[in-house]
């Protein structure tokens, strides 16, 4: 018999898996303060079809208890007395960046009508699924395999507050996993400190002479709880690891893994280990672990993909905080990748230099969630402050002229806003680069590395890039998303020539002989005497805010049409080619399968996707396809910020926000400042 999950409401909309909220709410009574105070938990429960209620339950109602917490007895007693069912609630196996005790809300819950996944004395919904469900659906197992690879590659775990720069010892070791003292899973297993000491002794006995690394729980490292091991257990060959390190890095260096019942044992299975298990967790007994206390009822042999599919795809309910809806596992991975990256970048704090006053509140929102940014105007002072306060240093890219600078350079991203930066509309996308900056080819950048590495994408990355490509081309999104619809343009061989800001950093660093809009127009006309040339001035230049004007007389001689205040996406659908110095419109044209000719060395040139008349760096020898270029440029490289939830977010959320003028528009203060700057356009140094 196939057990029914707590929620059965997933359906597929093209490539996207959608989870619908329940249409009717069942009363769920609770007697635990956590259900009252945790807003996101209450919201997930509501979307799952439960109405959290105080009082006494009636027949047909349910009582909620939190796992096997010490105060669960109240719920058990009332459920028994009122003869109603129990619903056991627990965090899902991927929870958040930081533990709940540190304040992060959950991204998923487990709702179990039968038992607790960590208590083997009574079967739970997950165990029933692992026992009886065929778990043989090809699409389900494909999703599981892809998610396992993705989780390992991106270092995603239940908690994710660790830096990827931290590495375990270089020498091989036996990994022994500690757990929080008195945890419900430990109590359910009927074990204590003596059993943890026995586990450590077994690891020493079975691996004589080997180094042993004891991994502390995240809450132990943060000082929120204590564990079963301490510094007293350290010897010449035993080390207590109290530094937050990715579990996936730890598994790479481990010759064996020992655990009582930690979720890290499950992750060890996903990493290819067969862990020694001394407790009776949900992942024991299926032929994937070496069980010291075998469970007689678990006789089935499962694959890693089957175990993962049940535990991570079918069993939990997942929540999307951006769209405020239930979602699939893949959406939670999008969320955790974005939020974990932000924490890993920002948790040490930043000293920020070269940031204009109007940008600072928005930069504070994006980069200052862990520690507020310290702003400095002088680069030398910023460097000293960075060293003194042990913070990282970020510099607006155009303000850092030193190519050898160790600072992280910051610049607007490629899906920026609905409106221009020069009109003080804050960006929803920013890039940070520790090597260089994407527009300057004189030095390698992180984007350049990512494009080179995108020659080979995983299947899940290809699927995501394809979906994003379709979203961008269907919605017509570009960097700024402004302007009117282009007029109908007829004729053969229509060439778009995008104007640029002539003192823009990409012009100053990535062009050769042709570095003005007039020189560009002249060169394109000389090379294409019979083509229809469409000149589109840069919107900042049109507004009188930046340099780069081509006179009406000059443009009338060289171009067939001059198109002002036009949304470029409506123009790209009507042209055959784009000829440019370094404009981002060249990249946007590639996304729409147009021929692109470059006179400079923009980030997208030199990879075999453009016809290059300039001199891209010879080091660009990789040959990614268009999806590889898109994945590196729009998914892997930038950071995105959701103006609605004020959270780091995946690119797909920004795509949706950019279609909503209210979500992605001006703040009232910046709207006033923008109008004032228009009056002071000739004094741009005051506001740029």
Placement of each model-derived feature along the sequence:
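Catalytic-core helical/loop segments in enzymes performing group transfer/polymerization on anionic/lipid-linked
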Residues: 2-688
